[in-house]
UniProtKB/Swiss-Prot annotation:
CDD domains: AspRS_core, EcAspRS_like_N. One of its GO terms (cellular component) is cytoplasm. ATP binds at R224, D225, E226, Q233, E488, G540, L541, D542, R543. It is found in: Cytoplasm. PANTHER family: ASPARTATE--TRNA LIGASE, MITOCHONDRIAL, ASPARTYL/LYSYL-TRNA SYNTHETASE. Homodimer. L-aspartate binds at E178, R224, H458, R495. The record marks H30 as: Important for tRNA non-discrimination. Residues 202-205 are annotated as: Aspartate. The gene is aspS. GO terms for biological process: aspartyl-tRNA aminoacylation. This is Aspartate--tRNA(Asp/Asn) ligase. Keywords: Aminoacyl-tRNA synthetase, ATP-binding, Cytoplasm, Ligase, Nucleotide-binding, Protein biosynthesis. It catalyses: tRNA(Asx) + L-aspartate + ATP = L-aspartyl-tRNA(Asx) + AMP + diphosphate.
Length: 595
């Protein structure tokens, strides 16, 4: 029977007999004495087999190799001074093995080195193909244990301190195609009908509030059939929450306390509360993005008023067309950034054009506040405009001013992209710094040019600001996103809980009363039976753990992730199925492989 985990042993156990289980991380033979680093998920401890002191274990120790699975019984001993290893938690001790039992060996060559004692760069596809080996590696094991700690602290805070209850909601539900594509599941017992896997438990958690559950949470599995990026998966996990009878400030305060609790318990980091707040309009104006990274400055400056009557038609034309002109002021940019990088062919030019811009205009502020720029700008810049630009941007000699001009969306995208790129390149971002904030007051709707209609920016169950009910199409939503160093980790809103308001929102996004009732009649009916005011939020667990672990991809904090092609290299999913299975489901495939 196991008495301890490998990484939990310390000098307190010296002279005690222990039994351990684990994998051989490394084996060394020093002058006839064999040293084995035994590894389990808790860490590593050194096993010693000495033919003089522990002769019974020695013949077995001679035969073991890396990744063999062992049972080891022995006595904890103090390491000699010259053998102390401060790099591991058990570096003061070693185990003299009285017994070693090989529980299983390795019969094939390892596809990569698992041991943390050797560094080897392994292609991600190989890691995913042999994920069970990859998860033995220290970094990956620690990531999964960190994920467990985060979930454990979420549960502790919500249940023990805030009176939440955990409720599971259905995985097989009906399709309500508003947003990303659903994963569909054919029903065998109802031929021709389909379930959908949930993109979120949104409607069910609202119905739980109607049911009087008051405060609900769930570690929810969600599914979206969409094109993947580094921070997306077709199946993902979120902390899903819903609360009745709380005002918007109360919901924000509760969630701030939750996040502060997680950071303190998991990383021993103190988060200052309350968190800063930006409205959507402020975030877009100052940063060009609704999830700003506020660890550094380089804020955008709107200079449309200065150039509305400019003779430089690129600027004045953009403003006359309903667009804008903004500046990204860069201190010491004259020295750090060459013209080659800004002009066609340069890396910054490419960043801007990839975001939709046609190019980058610039002004270099020289000594005595002389402006160095292209002739078309310089020739059309009045002294009053020059002075106004200096005052508004705070520019000083050495500043480089990068301009975006055009439709507001493109200007924001291009300059916010340049801001982030330059923040990294100029060393302005402290990787150890943590900036959390709320972004609030999002627009209720955005225009879908392809479908020529309004659609909900978040989802159509978000409550509009009561001040904006007279002009719902232009309404602000009672919505809020939590941002962690420029990445959204959670988002939520107060919900609509009155049938007439919900019907107005459905009508605004182009749903007829018949369509709305067909898709959401069960929710509309529930609103007739005493629905409490309520609101909620969902946190992307994968993304939050990724950030806490300092990883670049959520695939490194998920046990068995999919690739960016939504496939599992370990199990070869998705796969074809037998024609008999399809027939039972009344389904036929129309796919024909390319010739």
């Amino acid at each position: 029977m196991r008495t301890h985990y490998c990484g939990d042993l310390s000098a307190i156990e010296i002279e005690k007999s222990v039994t351990l289980f684990g994998w051989v991380d490394r084996r060394r033979d020093h002058g006839g004495v064999i040293f084995i680093d035994l590894r389990d998920r808790s860490g590593i401890v050194q096993i010693v087999s000495d033919p003089q002191r522990t002769p019974a274990s020695y013949p077995i120790a001679e035969t073991v190799r890396n990744e063999y699975v062992l049972k080891v019984t022995g006595t904890v001993s103090q390491r000699p001074t010259e053998s102390l290893n401060p790099r591991i938690a058990t570096g003061e001790i070693e185990i003299y093995a009285t017994s070693i039992e090989i529980l299983n060996g390795v019969t094939k060559q390892l596809p990569f080195v698992v041991s943390s004692s050797e560094s080897e760069s392994v292609r991600e596809d190989v890691r995913l193909r042999y994920r069970y080996l990859d998860l033995r590696r220290e970094r990956m094991s620690q990531n999964l244990q960190l994920r467990h700690q985060v979930v454990k602290e979420m549960r502790r805070f919500l249940e023990d301190e805030q009176h939440f209850i955990e409720v599971e909601t259905p995985i097989l539900t009906r399709s309500t195609p508003e947003g990303a594509r659903d994963y569909l599941v054919p029903s065998r017992v109802n031929p021709g009908q389909w379930y959908a896997l949930p993109q979120s438990p949104q409607l069910f958690k609202q119905l739980l509030m109607v049911s009087g559950m008051d405060r609900y949470y769930q570690i929810a599995r969600c599914f979206r059939d969409e094109d993947l990026r580094a921070d997306r998966q077709p199946e993902f996990t979120q902390l899903d929450m819903e609360m009745s009878f709380l005002s918007l400030p109360e919901i924000l305060a509760l969630n701030e306390a939750l996040i502060a609790h997680i950071f303190k318990k998991v990383k021993n980091i103190d988060i200052s509360l309350p968190l800063p707040r930006l409205t959507y309009a402020e975030a877009m104006d100052r940063y060009g993005i609704d999830r700003p990274d506020t660890r550094f400055g380089l804020e955008l400056v709107n200079v449309a008023e200065i150039f509305a009557d400019s003779g430089f038609k690129v600027f004045s034309g953009a403003i006359a067309s309903g667009g804008t002109v903004k500046v990204l002021p860069i201190p010491n940019g004259n020295e750090a950034i060459s013209n080659v990088r800004i002009k066609p062919g340069g890396d910054l030019f490419k960043e801007a054009t990839d975001a939709g811009a046609k190019g980058i205009a610039y002004i270099r502020v020289r000594e005595d506040y002389d402006f160095d720029t292209i002739g078309a700008i310089k020739d059309n810049l009045t002294e009053a405009q020059k002075q106004a630009l200096i005052e508004k941007t705070g520019a000083k000699p050495g500043h480089l001013l990068l301009f975006g001009a055009g439709d507001t969306d493109t200007v924001n995208k291009s300059l916010s992209r340049l801001r982030l790129v330059l923040g990294e390149q100029l060393g302005l971002i402290d990787p150890e710094k943590i900036n959390l904030l709320w972004v609030t007051d999002f627009p209720m709707f955005e225009y879908n040019a392809e479908e020529k209609r309004l659609e909900a920016l978040h989802h159509p169950f978000t409550a509009p600001n009561p001040e904006d009910l007279e002009d719902l199409a232009q309404a602000r939503a009672l919505a809020y996103d939590m941002i962690f160093n420029g990445i959204e980790i959670g988002g939520g809103s107060l919900r609509i809980y009155q049938r007439e308001v919900q019907e107005k929102v459905f009508a605004t996004i182009g749903l007829s009363p018949e369509e709305a009732y067909n898709k959401f009649g069960f929710l509309l009916e529930a609103f007739e039976y005493g629905t409490p005011p309520h609101g909620g939020i969902a946190y992307g667990l994968d993304r939050l753990v990724m950030l806490l672990a300092g990883e670049e991809s959520i695939r490194d904090v998920i046990a068995f992730p999919k690739t960016q092609q939504a496939s599992c290299l370990l199990t070869s999913a998705p796969s074809t199925v037998a024609a008999k299975q399809l027939k039972e489901l009344s389904v036929a495939s129309t796919y024909k492989p390319p010739s």
